[in-house]
């Protein structure tokens, strides 16, 4: 599972709104689209260890780089709304038709928004570690994490990261550090420097705070039960911002939701909880 380079499929590209978007895929069958997060260096490569196993399970497993991430073109003006809207446009350009979404981190909010807006396009939704889809933190929980995260975000936008910075970032988000190979670090660092770093800096200045653009009258976590397609949610108990406790609260509040909370798992759910994702995700998608 650590020999990432040997698992890497060929880079492919499609054109969306005049931008060249890079994607990787494996297998054939019903489409499953993996959506990466928003931190510096995020790209389709974070799913390299997941595509092959899902392909072997009978799916066309696909992951793409959002505009401004990885090897995709960088738009003149970036926004979270543009990233979200690139998802259905990529689906059309890549010929995925009706597809399941496996969304990590901030992309979970995108997936839920899109599935609520046009349920006919999406067969299933799997959410991995999306904190914005949990009940908010209590006053007692808010504090140290936010201060540390704000400092890290500022530092990441000030100086181009080193290879060691890339390793530390992965270690901070992964419970089992033995999963992090030199190849993982090299791939992450590649997507953190050069034009990607400049794009990250630009996003800090251009992005609106809400993933959907306008403020929402009802938080997305309160709308999860409105989804028309099957929904599976997986969180790491040791994830940031008390995610484990908040996931327990959501599970107790809405026992009808399929929520799995994995011990020994931080934010990189698809790495730390690889076996859990396969064990729960494959039969869920086959249902």
Report each predicted region and the residues it spans.
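Conserved HGGG/HGGXW glycine-rich cap/lid loop of the alpha/beta-hydrolase fold
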Residues: 15-71
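Short alpha-helix in the alpha/beta-hydrolase fold that links the catalytic acid
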Residues: 47, 184, 220, 229, ...
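Active-site loop/oxyanion-hole signature of alpha/beta-hydrolase fold enzymes
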Residues: 56, 63-102, 106, 136, ...
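Flexible "cap/lid" loop of the alpha/beta hydrolase fold
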Residues: 112, 116, 123-162, 168
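Conserved alpha/beta-hydrolase catalytic His-Asp/Glu region
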Residues: 142, 159-225
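Short beta-strand/loop motif that positions the catalytic acidic residue
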Residues: 227, 233-235
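Acidic catalytic loop of the alpha/beta-hydrolase fold
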Residues: 237-242
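Catalytic active-site module of serine/aspartate enzymes centered on a nucleophile-bearing elbow/loop
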Residues: 255-287
């Amino acid at each position: 599972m650590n020999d990432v380079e040997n698992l890497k499929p060929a880079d492919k590209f499609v054109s969306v709104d005049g931008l060249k978007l890079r994607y990787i895929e494996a297998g054939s069958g019903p489409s499953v689209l993996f959506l990466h997060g928003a931190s510096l260096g995020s790209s389709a490569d974070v799913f390299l260890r997941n595509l092959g196993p899902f392909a072997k399970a009978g799916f066309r497993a696909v992951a793409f780089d959002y505009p401004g991430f990885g090897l995709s073109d960088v738009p003149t003006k970036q926004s979270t709304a543009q990233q979200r809207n690139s998802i259905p446009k990529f689906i059309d350009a890549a010929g995925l038709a009706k597809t399941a979404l496996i969304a990590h981190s901030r992309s979970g909010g995108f997936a839920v928004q899109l599935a609520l807006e046009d349920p006919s396009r999406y067969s299933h939704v799997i959410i991995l570690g999306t904190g914005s889809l949990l009940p908010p933190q209590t006053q007692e929980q808010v504090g140290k994490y936010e201060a540390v995260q704000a400092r890290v975000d500022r530092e990441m936008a000030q100086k181009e990261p080193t290879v060691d910075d890339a390793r530390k970032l992965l270690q901070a988000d992964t419970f089992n550090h033995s999963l992090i190979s030199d190849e993982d670090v090299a791939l992450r660092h590649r997507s953190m420097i050069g034009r990607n770093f400049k794009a990250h800096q630009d996003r800090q200045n251009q992005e609106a705070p809400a993933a959907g653009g306008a403020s929402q009258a009802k938080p997305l976590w309160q709308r999860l039960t409105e989804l028309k397609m099957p929904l599976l949610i997986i969180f790491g108990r040791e994830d940031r911002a008390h995610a484990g406790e908040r996931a327990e609260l959501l599970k107790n509040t809405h026992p009808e939701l399929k929520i799995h909370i994995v011990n020994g798992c931080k934010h990189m759910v698809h790495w730390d909880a690889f076996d859990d994702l396969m064990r729960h995700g494959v039969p869920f998608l086959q249902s």
